[in-house]
């Protein structure tokens, strides 16, 4: 007789394979068509709120794998909080202004067409370009299963948003922190605009290294009691800045020496200068820095005076100890020049070429031929003009600032720019902005903790923030200047009127409306007396003000300020984290975030940066089409994301294997609880059930603890270990007999099913933030006992496994199971046995702490465990120094359950006879 029909074999329609690339898009479409985000809000109304403030990606081009890592990580964290019962908010955003978009539009137009085009028309084209990529990227993010307020994103070029960026600027101005200065800043001659520190990249560049003699004036020599040749030797890597030299900085605490051949260098650098062949003479006289202070040397290029000044910035780790100082071309030069009244000479135009001032100020001999010449092409002619004053010249490669967009080397160039002053105190505050920002950092939690040690020193050491740009596509610094006095108008009525016009017409109003139209009705100002400031804001100001425009404005249902979390790549320590911190500290004196998480960058399998030229780019769209977004999401969760991440086809295939393990574990659990109508009471669980429930409780608490601290790698490693070892490796294996062969409603079967149902549901709540699609699919196939009133995954709230006391200490049992497995391994290989049910174990029964005989037999998946056996001994193993012997089972194989517990092979065992007979 075939007893298969009498077995309760697992049943489920939940498919073994997910067919994710085909099925996910349909499910995601349903979610977004029914606005699942709004449903999530409604389901958690009144609950504790978790706010994740989304840092805006740039609306230019398709998303790359780094974008996918970032948004998936945010989605996992948001959903983790949601499934823990919290209300959540994430309003996605896009950065839409700035140079990269201008460049793309310029490329399409051509330079001459762009220059002939009115600013308003050019801005219109930039707006259209950005709008197109907002739509493209939104769809790409949605294809990753990311749930956010996609219907109401923040877009920095929206009219109201531009108005609020401008209002943030006005708030900074009202607090006295907005200043206009003529000072050197990073200048991109290729893009013709100022840059902020966050827009600077460092690349290797070959430059000249030159040593130049500046002869002392006759009056200086007389004061020092010197005759004959005597001059200071400077070192520089930028010969093109020498025409703008107006000073030489020396260290106030150092001694200087005059050599026999007439050169003055720092005593601490003298030996190095001899070694390098810069000077040759004996050090014949020592001179204190204070003796040189205020004396004049002569610039050998143009005979203009160069004043010797004291500067703390002069170091002794290189050069001569005498620093060429051109206040128009360097931050330190400018500071020391300001302190000592040095003239700021700046003969370079926005294209990086010498302008007419080289002629007007006699900065170079035969200056006319230098007008219009690019400064980098002027190095060689200048070296020739130095003649004998050029003591040594060589070339070397060093790390040099480059423009983030054009990739061209930058220069320092003194121009009129707008700055947020870091070392001034906002009105009403007793702290400078720097102090307020540094103090605010101490209130923030950082993951990883080392992230704090990156942000804090950056803020402690940063210069004033240059927020003006000489471009067209951005929010204008929309202030009026009085033509006659150059005074800037900060009249509150005027500022708010301009902001209200931006609300209605966008920042384009600054370009399309006349001054008269931009002034409020009945204004006391005469439009004829005023001019518009033409600069626009740095895009880092746009994104740095999003806490104000999104979280505080009331225009979005975006959550709380300060936000619970900001999460971006580690490059944002000098970007968004910092710009947001400075503006929030300037206006409110607090950080805009409670927690910062940083992640690394995505690399190929060899750990190399991805680039189209290398052909190693992994596009999210390709991954989703090949593997499904769930695999990409699991890759993120299984990544040590705080460091750089490797991704490749092989890595994704390994991730897909882990996904299959999780999926098939749930499939087995679903299939085995399909006929369970009610959970058993707590006292009905057997020893094995209590063991797995206790183990699951500990493991899930540990997983939850890891997830709470955003350590998804550790959490998933803990969960995977449990699934592989205790759950699938032991419990799901050892309980098959009771699930398939016991009577349908037997206590032991229902208890195990109940344990499986509880574990499944708790485990579902832990995987749902990552594998949301799969969790939803599991629920669709789950029996009523499992899902109750749940319609979809977004109805789910994590439920921990009930606390269950362990029924036994499993240490000895796990060791015994492993030793038994090792002992019989050869029996299987040599085909002495086909299955462990053919065996029985004999030994000290009391050493094995499971009291129920059947549970103990199931633990080893054998037909008997007893004190002694008369069956043929085939193996043995030792536990705690005691020997257990393994024997062929004495009884016959039951044709139904295959346990060797029957009197003959034709007869059912006692248990099966009862079940079938009933």
Curated annotation (Swiss-Prot):
Q: What is the lineage of its organism?
A: Bacteria, Pseudomonadati, Campylobacterota, Epsilonproteobacteria, Campylobacterales
Keyword annotations for this protein, in alphabetical order, are: Aminoacyl-tRNA synthetase, ATP-binding, Cytoplasm, Ligase, Metal-binding, Nucleotide-binding, Protein biosynthesis, Zinc
Reaction equation(s) it catalyzes: tRNA(Ile) + L-isoleucine + ATP = L-isoleucyl-tRNA(Ile) + AMP + diphosphate
Q: What is this protein called?
A: Isoleucine--tRNA ligase
Q: Where does L-isoleucyl-5'-AMP bind?
A: 568
Q: What biological-process GO terms show up in the record?
A: isoleucyl-tRNA aminoacylation
**UniProt-listed Enzyme Commission number(s):** 6.1.1.5
Q: Which family does it belong to?
A: Belongs to the class-I aminoacyl-tRNA synthetase family. IleS type 1 subfamily.
Please provide, alphabetically and separated by semicolons, the GO molecular function terms listed in this UniProt record.
Answer: aminoacyl-tRNA deacylase activity; ATP binding; isoleucine-tRNA ligase activity; tRNA binding; zinc ion binding
């Amino acid at each position: 007789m075939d007893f298969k029909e009498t077995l309760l074999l697992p049943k489920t329609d939940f498919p073994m394979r997910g067919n994710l690339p085909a099925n996910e898009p349909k499910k995601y479409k349903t979610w977004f068509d029914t606005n699942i985000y709004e449903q999530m809000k409604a389901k958690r109304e009144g609950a504790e709120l978790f706010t994740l403030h989304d840092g805006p990606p740039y609306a230019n081009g398709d998303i790359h794998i780094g974008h996918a890592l970032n948004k998936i990580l945010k989605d996992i964290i948001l959903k983790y909080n949601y499934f823990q019962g919290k209300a959540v908010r994430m309003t996605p955003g896009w950065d839409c202004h700035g140079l990269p978009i201008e460049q793309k539009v310029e490329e399409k137009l051509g330079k001459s067409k762009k220059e002939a085009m009115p600013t308003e028309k050019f801005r219109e084209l930039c707006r259209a370009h950005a709008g197109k990529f907002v739509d493209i990227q939104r769809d790409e993010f949605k294809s990753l299963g990311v749930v956010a307020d996609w219907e109401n994103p923040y877009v920095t070029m929206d009219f109201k948003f531009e108005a609020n960026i401008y209002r943030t600027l006005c708030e900074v101005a009202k607090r006295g922190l907005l200043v206009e200065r003529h000072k050197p800043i990073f200048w991109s001659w290729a893009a013709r605009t100022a840059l902020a520190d966050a827009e600077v990249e460092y690349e290797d560049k070959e430059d000249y290294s030159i040593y130049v003699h500046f002869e002392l004036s006759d009056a200086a020599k007389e004061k020092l009691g010197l005759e004959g040749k005597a001059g200071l030797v400077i070192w520089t890597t930028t010969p093109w800045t020498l025409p703008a030299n107006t000073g030489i900085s020396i260290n106030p605490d150092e001694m200087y020496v005059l050599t026999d051949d007439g050169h003055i260098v720092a005593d601490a650098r003298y030996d190095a200068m001899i070694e390098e062949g810069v000077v040759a003479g004996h050090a014949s006289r020592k001179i204190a820095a204070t003796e040189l202070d205020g004396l004049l040397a002569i610039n050998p290029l143009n005979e203009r005076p160069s004043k010797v000044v004291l500067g703390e910035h002069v170091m002794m780790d290189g050069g001569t100890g005498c620093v060429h100082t051109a206040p128009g071309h360097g931050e330190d030069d400018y500071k020391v020049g300001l302190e000592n009244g040095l003239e700021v000479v700046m003969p370079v135009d926005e294209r990086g070429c010498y302008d007419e001032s080289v002629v007007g100020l006699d900065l170079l001999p035969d200056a006319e031929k230098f007008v219009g010449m690019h400064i980098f092409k002027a190095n060689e002619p200048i070296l020739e003009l130095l003649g004998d004053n050029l003591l040594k010249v060589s070339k070397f490669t060093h790390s040099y600032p480059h423009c983030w967009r054009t990739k061209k080397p930058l220069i320092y160039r003194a121009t009129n720019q707008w700055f947020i002053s870091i070392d001034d105190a906002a009105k009403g505050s007793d702290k400078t902005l720097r102090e307020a920002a540094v103090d605010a950092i101490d209130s923030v939690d950082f993951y990883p903790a080392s992230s704090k040690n990156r942000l804090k020193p950056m803020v402690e050491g940063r210069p004033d923030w240059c927020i003006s740009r000489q471009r067209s596509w951005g929010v204008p610094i929309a202030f009026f200047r009085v033509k006659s006095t150059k005074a800037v108008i900060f009249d509150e009525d005027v500022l708010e009127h301009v902001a209200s016009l931006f609300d209605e017409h966008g920042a384009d109003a600054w370009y399309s409306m006349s001054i008269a139209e931009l002034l409020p009705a009945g204004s006391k100002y005469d439009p004829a007396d005023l001019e518009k400031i033409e600069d626009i804001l740095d895009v880092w100001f746009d994104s740095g003000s999003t806490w104000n425009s999104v979280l505080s404005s009331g225009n979005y249902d975006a959550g709380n300020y300060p936000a619970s979390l900001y999460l971006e790549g580690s490059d944002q320590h000098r970007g968004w984290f910092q710009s947001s911190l400075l503006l929030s500290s300037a206006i409110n004196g607090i950080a805009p975030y409670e927690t910062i998480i940083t992640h690394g960058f995505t690399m190929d399998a060899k750990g190399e940066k991805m680039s189209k030229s290398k052909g190693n780019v992994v596009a999210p769209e390709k991954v989703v089409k090949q593997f499904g977004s769930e695999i990409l999401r699991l890759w993120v969760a299984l990544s040590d994301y705080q460091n750089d991440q490797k991704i490749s086809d092989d890595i994704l295939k390994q991730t897909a294997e882990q996904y299959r393990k999780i999926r098939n574990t749930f499939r087995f659990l679903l299939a085995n609880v399909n006929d369970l109508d009610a959970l058993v009471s707590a006292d009905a669980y057997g020893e094995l059930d209590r063991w797995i429930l206790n183990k699951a409780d500990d493991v899930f608490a540990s997983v939850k603890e890891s997830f709470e601290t955003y350590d998804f790698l550790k959490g998933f490693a803990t969960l995977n270990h449990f699934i592989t070892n205790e759950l699938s490796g032991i419990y799901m294996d050892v309980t098959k007999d009771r699930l398939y062969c016991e009577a349908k409603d037997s206590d032991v079967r229902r208890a195990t099913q109940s344990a499986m149902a509880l574990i499944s549901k708790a485990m579902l709540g832990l995987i749902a933030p990552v594998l949301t699609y799969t969790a939803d699919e599991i629920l669709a196939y789950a029996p009523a006992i499992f899902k109750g009133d749940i319609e979809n995954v977004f109805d789910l709230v994590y439920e921990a496994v009930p606390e269950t006391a362990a029924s036994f200490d499993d240490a000895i049992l796990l060791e015994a199971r492993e030793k038994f497995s090792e002992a019989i391994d050869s029996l299987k290989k040599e085909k002495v046995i086909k299955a462990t049910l053919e065996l029985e174990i004999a030994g000290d029964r009391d050493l094995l702490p499971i009291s129920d005989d059947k549970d103990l037999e199931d633990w080893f998946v054998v037909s008997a465990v007893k004190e002694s056996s008369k069956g043929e001994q085939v193996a043995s193993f030792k536990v705690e120094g005691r020997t257990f012997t393994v024997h062929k089972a004495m009884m016959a194989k039951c044709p139904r359950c295959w346990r060797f517990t029957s009197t003959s092979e034709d007869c059912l065992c006692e248990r099966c006879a009862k079940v079938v007979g009933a």
